[in-house]
A protein has these predicted regions:
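Short cysteine clusters
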Residues: 1, 32-35, 148, 188, ...
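Compact, charge-rich alpha-helical regulatory domains located at protein termini
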Residues: 1-39
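Flexible, glycine/charged-enriched surface loops at secondary-structure junctions
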Residues: 33-36, 49-54, 102-109, 140-141, ...
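Generic secondary-structure signature for well-ordered alpha-helical cores
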Residues: 44, 48, 98, 102, ...
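Long, charged amphipathic helices and adjacent flexible linkers at domain junctions
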Residues: 52-66, 138-141
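Small-residue-enriched alpha-helical segments and adjacent helix-cap loops
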Residues: 74-207, 211, 306-325
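A glycine-rich phosphate-binding loop feature that marks nucleotide/adenosyl-phosphate handling sites
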Residues: 148, 182-190, 258-270, 290-294
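Mobile "lid/hinge" segments at catalytic clefts and subdomain interfaces of large enzymes
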Residues: 187, 191, 196-256
Length: 325
């Protein structure tokens, strides 16, 4: 793809290109397998429900909505909003683990439960029995919103971090980005949700305000977040974070995490665009948030209506002939 991202986006919009094959046909110079996944992500963000999904443009994980493991089985991570679950959900998870002989059930660092070792042809049945939405643990999208218990239970909490985390996760579930995105919401500066090393973090401060942080990392590369701004209400926090997420989605390079994106753009510029609305894009960001949220459909519902024949069929083994010497 010979065009930089801003030029590519402008051409795609002008020509109304809504599928990867259409973009490659009109704007590409050669068939490029490596660019397909990035184009698919970009087009889904641009067009929402109008995007024409071609599964051969996506990685195997995205085709079956589960994360393939080294032995060819898959992991299933249901959505638990803000890391909060219920007795009924836990019972169903346990029943599924027994019914399908799941070899490992593991708590994740993002306050979720991972069922590992699921056979491909069991995926639709597992999803149906769980009765929970996809946690998007397999793709470049919003993953988790980690929370502490906040002011509802903790004697140190200065604000309701759990409620904000749940609201954020429900608002932005299914949003896809150039790379995965993880959030954290801490109910006080003790930072039990590790918000200062998330792609987007929120920390409650004295006086009931929320401090919004961006560009953190806690993996192979560790980076403390930059302070974006402070806001007074939960609604303001959700809105500011939405604007940042769309700005990141529209301007980041494919596979560029926020911890690279924010330093590349510069926190002063990011703050100017998001908080001060220096480019006059605030209304655009808000519109894109609502359009993307409206286009959300739980991908695990494909269990009832697969997109293509054999989508969840087990891989067939092929017996090779024995060659005589």
């Amino acid at each position: 793809m010979p065009l930089d991202k801003p030029t590519l986006v402008a051409e795609v919009k002008k020509r109304g290109l809504k599928s990867v094959s259409a973009v490659l046909r009109e704007l590409g110079t050669a068939e490029d397998e490596k660019s397909k996944a990035g184009l698919a992500s970009m087009l889904k963000g641009l067009w929402g429900a109008e995007y024409i999904d071609q599964r051969d443009a996506r990685f195997v994980n995205d085709r079956v909505h589960a994360n393939i493991q080294k032995d060819g089985t898959y992991s299933v991570v249901p959505r638990t909003y803000g890391g909060v679950t219920t007795a009924d959900e836990l019972i169903r998870i346990g029943e599924v683990a027994k019914k399908y002989n799941v070899p490992m059930v593991k708590y994740t660092g993002g306050q979720r439960i991972d069922l590992l070792g699921i056979k491909k042809d069991d995926l639709p049945k597992v999803w149906a029995d769980l009765g929970m939405p996809s946690g998007y643990a397999y793709t470049k999208a919003l993953r988790t919103v980690k929370t502490c218990v906040g002011s509802e239970f903790c004697r140190y909490g200065t604000n309701d971090s759990t409620a904000l985390g749940i609201a954020l996760e429900k608002k932005y579930q299914g949003f896809e980005f150039p790379a995965k995105v993880k959030l954290g919401v801490s109910g006080c500066p003790r930072n039990c949700a590790e918000s200062t090393v998330k792609d987007v973090g929120v920390v409650a401060t004295e006086g009931g305000e929320w401090e919004i942080l961006v560009g953190g990392a806690a993996g192979a590369h560790v980076r403390k977040t930059d302070v974006l701004c402070r806001v007074k209400t939960q609604a303001e926090a959700i809105a500011v974070i939405g604007r940042f997420l769309i700005y990141y989605r529209d301007n980041a390079k494919w596979l560029e995490r926020t911890y690279d994106f924010v330093p590349r753009m510069g926190i002063e510029k990011v703050r100017d665009v998001i908080v001060n609305d220096s480019l006059g894009l605030g209304e655009h960001f808000d519109t894109e948030v609502e359009k993307t949220a409206a286009a959300y459909v739980d991908p695990w519902l494909e269990r009832d209506k697969p997109v293509y024949p054999g989508q969840f069929a087990a891989a067939r083994s092929i017996a090779l002939p024995v060659l005589s010497s």
